[in-house]
Swiss-Prot record:
This is tRNA nucleotidyltransferase cca1. The gene is cca1. Cca1 contains two alpha-helices (His-81 to Thr-86 and Glu-479 to Asp-484) and a beta-sheet (His-120 to Lys-131) that are not seen in cca2, suggesting that cca1 has lost A-adding activity because this beta-sheet reduces the flexibility of the loop (Asp-122 to Glu-139) as compared to CCA- and A-adding enzymes. tRNA nucleotidyltransferase involved in the synthesis of the tRNA CCA terminus. In contrast to what is usually observed in eukaryotes for which one enzyme synthesizes the whole tRNA CCA terminus, in S.pombe, cca1 specifically adds two cytidine residues to a tRNA substrate lacking this sequence while cca2 specifically adds the terminal adenosine residue thereby completing the CCA sequence. GO terms for biological process: mitochondrial tRNA 3'-end processing; tRNA 3'-terminal CCA addition. Residues 122-139 are annotated as: Flexible loop. Belongs to the tRNA nucleotidyltransferase/poly(A) polymerase family. GO terms for molecular function: CC tRNA cytidylyltransferase activity; CTP binding; tRNA binding. It comes from the Eukaryota. Its EC number is 2.7.7.-. InterPro entries: NT_sf, PolA_pol_head_dom. It comes from Schizosaccharomyces pombe (strain 972 / ATCC 24843). It is an enzyme of class 2 (transferase). Changing residue 121 to E: Restores the B/A element but does not restore A-adding activity.
Amino acid sequence: MASSSSILELNETEKELSDIFLNVSKKIGQMDRKEPEVRFAGGWVRDKLLRIESHDIDVAIDCMSGFEFAQHLQSYLAQQHPDWETKVIKIDANPLKSKHLETATARIMGMDIDIVNLRHHDYTNSNSSNKLVFGTPLEDALRRDATINALFYNLKSKTVEDFTGKGLVDLSNKIIRTPLVADETFGDDPLRAVRCIRFATKYDFNIHEETIKGLKNPELHERLRSSISRERIGVEVDKMLKHCNTNRALKIIHSLGMFACIFGPLEIHTKKLQSKNIESLSLIPYAIDLFGYLQKKDVSIKNLSSSSKYIFWLAIATLPWYNWSILEKSKIKILPPILIRDSLKYSKPIMSQVENFFVHYPLIMSKINVLEKEGKLTRLGCGRLVRELGPHWRDIIDWAFFMNTLISNSDIQRLNKDEEVTWFHVLVKHIEEYGMEEAYNIQPIINGNEITRILGIRPGPHLRKMLDDSIEWRIQNPESTKEDYIAIMLEKGTSAVVDS
C-alpha cells in the first residue's frame, strides 16, 4: 500500500499545470471513457521533497498512452490558451536500445513535460506486440531505476505516493537503491546503472550494497557497451560532469569496473587499432585525486573555467587509452579523442580540445626542457607556441603540467616543492610578458596580392611561406609598420626576413 505521508508545496505554475491536467482528465471522463488518474512522477517529486526547483515534469497516466492523453491536452489548450501554441511531439519506443515506452513531450508554461502510461510489470516485452498494456502504480514504481525516483504525486488527492514502501525512507536516509533486485532493474535498461551513479554523486547519497553488487555484474557491463545507444550514455556522462561531484562519480565508476564500458573502445574500433598497450586503469584514482588537489592548490588550475574543467575531466576519463592508436582515413591517430566522438557521441569541438591536450603534450614538454636549460624562451618562440596551441593554450599548458606530474608519480603532498611547477608557470609568464596571449589571432602584415605586385612575382606555394614569414616578423617587431616590412622585403626579395 502506498505511503502518502508527505505533502508538497506547489508553486503557482505547478498549481496551474495541475489544474490543467485534472481538467483534461475530467473532459476525457465526460466522453463515456474512464477518467484517467494523473500523477506527477519520478524526479520532479524527488526534487520537490528535497526542496529543489525543477523545470521538468514526468506525467504518468493509468489507462491510455501518453501520446493519446497529450492529444487531448493539446486540444484543451488550443481552446483555453490558443496563444500558447502548444505542440506535442511523439517519441516512439525503441526496445533495441532499451527504450521501452512511447513518450509524448510538450513545453507548457516554461516547463518541459513528458507524458507516459504507467509501466506494466512486463513492459519490456509487452510493447513488442501491437496491444498496449497498462500497468498499475505499484507495477510502474517497481520498474523504475531507483526507489527515490519511484515516488508519485497524485494530482487529485494532492499527496505523495510511495508504492515501493522504500522511496521516502531512502530519500531521508540518502540511499540509492533499485526497487527490485538490481540485476532485474538494470536488465530492463542497463543505462539505469549509470543513472544510479549520477544520482548518488549529484545528491551526495550512498549506493545500497545490494545495488552495488548489481553494478559490478560483468553481464551488465557488456550490455552497456553493446546494446545501449552511445548518445544516451553521453547524455548521462555530460550531466555527471556538469551537475555532480565528478571526482566521486569517476571514482565510483572505476571501483565498479565500469570505466571501460562507459569510456573505452567499442567493437567498431577493434579492427582499426594499431597499437594496444596495457590499459592504464590503475592511474585513474591517482589522476582523479591529483586533479582535485591541483584545483585547490595550483595557482593556474584552480582558476580553470567550468568549460575547461569539463575538458580536463573528459581527458582524464580517456587517459587509460592514451598510448593506444587507431587507423582512420589512412592516418594513425591517438585513441582518446576518437572515444570522445564515438563512445560518448560528443561534438567535434569537444573532441578537438581533448585531442589538443594529448597531441601537444610533447611540444609543451620540449619548451619546458628549453626553459630548464636556458632559463628563457624568445619572443618568437612564445608566439609560435601560442599560434600552434590556439585559443586554449593556457589549458593545454595546464594539462601538460598535470600529465607530467601524473607520469612522474609525484607525491601530491610534495607538489608545491616540485621544480616542474615553477617552469610551467614561467612558460605562461613568458607568454604574458611578451604580450603573446592572443598570438593565434595575428594576421599577415601584408596580403598576397601586395607581395606579388611589389616583388613582381607570380602566385604559388612560396607565397604561403612569405605570408607566414610576415606574421613571424610582426611577432618579433610589434612596434614596426607595414611600410617597414615592405622596405625589408624589397631589400631581401623572396628570401626570409625572419630571424629564426
